[in-house]
Amino acid sequence: MKKIVLLTLLASVLFFSFERLSKTQTKPENTEQDKGRPKLIALKFGEPDELTYDAGTVRFLATSVDTNGAWSLVELKEMPGYHTNLHRHNHTDEAFYVMEGVLTVKINDKFSDYPAGSYVLIPRGTPHAQGNRGKVPARILLTMTPGGFERSFKDRVDLFKTAKPSDPDFRQKRKENAAKGNYDVEFLADWDLPT
């Protein structure tokens, strides 16, 4: 008899504990606790659309708006012959994962080639430049921490609609856009890709 009473008591305690626990763990969506959390992002192959800019194409996979400024992720397809100016980001780390082709990176006056499967992390404040000296497009995943610098690619997409890299003042317009947009980029020098 004692066992039956004890088991009944234990079952009642467990039942009411689980019921109370489930009520406390259920909360309405978009509460104060949700502020500062990244949005859910679920993209299928080919989403979102590729946008054309002066280096090739860009796809915005996760923007700083999606991650509350924590980071951003873009997929770049850089065409052969494209290269950046020597520059640095004083507040942004950049991480490159090469998916196709070869990415050439200049750090501390040293050029290195990174084929598909390579990963390069450039800490904030490091002068660097990158480009594609190969014969095929280089497809790259670029993560920026914190987010925000991806907005510069949006401006470059918009600039490409009205101006082309062959225009004599194209690079100057790009620098001016970067300065206006406050993208944490400091241009240091022009350079040419080694052949």
Outline where the language-model segments fall.
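Bacterial Sec-dependent N-terminal signal peptides
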Residues: 1-26
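Ligand-binding loop in jelly-roll beta-barrel domains
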Residues: 69, 104, 124-150
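Glycine- and acidic-residue-biased ligand/ion/polar-headgroup-sensing regions
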Residues: 91-103, 108
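Short acidic-glycine-tyrosine-enriched beta hairpin
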Residues: 109-127
